[in-house]
């Protein structure tokens, strides 16, 4: 099956000119890797968070969003993840893409310039029109209001 493709404008900022553009690691990858545009390496201590610049500005088309997600290897091997995962980049945002990382391990982790720190997915979005009602006539489901572990372990 052929994947749909959309064109997204991107600009490298001066502190990111030498870094790769976000790219897919494989032909079937859903997300593109984002790179740390740090001037110097930074140590992320346990339970510390850090806003890491990527050195890029993007113009996501209306009707789409950028989803910022952790890289699975960083999370599994080092406990480094995206704090507000998934982060959202709205189509009207025109500032630098920055990644809020947190170290959930008990060991310091060094982030170096050019490290792959997160992934971005460009995904379609819909906007909701609420149907505000006094009488709520939603059909019964097997779950109803059950949540927070109600479906078992």
Curated annotation (Swiss-Prot):
Keyword DNA-binding set for record: no
Highest taxon, organism lineage: Bacteria
InterPro entries: dUTPase, dUTPase-like, dUTPase-like_sf, dUTPase_trimeric
Cofactor: Mg(2+)
Record-listed substrate binding positions: 71-73, 84, 88-90, 98
GO MF entry, a single one: magnesium ion binding
Listed name of the protein: Deoxyuridine 5'-triphosphate nucleotidohydrolase
Organism (species): Wolbachia pipientis wMel
Gene that this polypeptide is encoded by: dut
């Amino acid at each position: 099956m052929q994947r749909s493709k959309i064109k997204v404008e991107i600009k490298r900022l001066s502190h990111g000119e030498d870094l790769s553009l976000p790219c897919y690691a494989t032909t079937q990858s859903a997300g593109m890797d984002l790179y740390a545009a740090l001037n110097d390496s930074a140590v992320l201590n346990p339970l510390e968070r850090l806003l890491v610049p990527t050195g890029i500005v993007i113009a996501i088309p209306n009707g789409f969003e950028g989803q910022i997600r952790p890289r699975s290897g960083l999370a599994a091997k080092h406990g480094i993840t995206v704090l507000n995962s998934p982060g959202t980049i709205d189509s009207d945002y025109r500032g630098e893409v920055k990644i809020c990382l947190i170290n959930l391990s008990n060991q310091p982790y060094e982030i170096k310039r050019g490290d792959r720190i997160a992934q971005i997915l460009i995904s379609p979005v819909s906007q909701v029109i609420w149907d505000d009602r006094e009488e709520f006539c939603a059909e019964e489901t097997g779950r109803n209001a059950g949540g927070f572990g109600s479906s078992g372990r």
